[in-house]
């Protein structure tokens, strides 16, 4: 693209304006990159903690696997795994929208306390904890993915500014400046030469 730019004063002015804009915007990009790095670190920690909680809840379920399969109480426990609604919102982090869980509504487990053993309450509690932590881990993973993708994109732009756009624009400004300077010197030389020829012709005409 730089080879297509004309070596003129107007082109020089435009390249100077372009460089000024690039150098003005770069600090903003670098700040966003730094903030995103912090947010990604936090998101990774949050996702890791959510996965650990989910896996711990799953282990609790496995520990009572035989009780979950008792035909007489399957229906009483089944609803504790059902999600009626996940209320999600989105918050803005460094200009990017990321999901946030506001509430997880589970189906009501309807069973008679008198007609079921006491351990049913424990199984229902474990079941609900398992489902809630599963949803939280999924949303935390989604948040992490979104922030990591944005960080990659911003990092690419910072690298583009630092390694390509600013150096190329700077080189083009120097190239145009050198060309204009050389042309100015050439023009001055040509003017002097023309004046010298005019003077010579004048002197020759006076001698004649």
Swiss-Prot record:
GO BP: proton motive force-driven plasma membrane ATP synthesis
The keyword Transport is assigned to this record: yes
InterPro entries, A to Z: V_ATPase_D
Example of a GO MF term: proton-transporting ATP synthase activity, rotational mechanism
Entry keyword set: ATP synthesis, Hydrogen ion transport, Ion transport, Transport
Family: Belongs to the V-ATPase D subunit family.
HAMAP family listed in its UniProt record: ATP_synth_D_arch
Function according to Swiss-Prot or TrEMBL: Produces ATP from ADP in the presence of a proton gradient across the membrane.
Protein name according to UniProt: V-type ATP synthase subunit D
Recorded name of the encoding gene: atpD
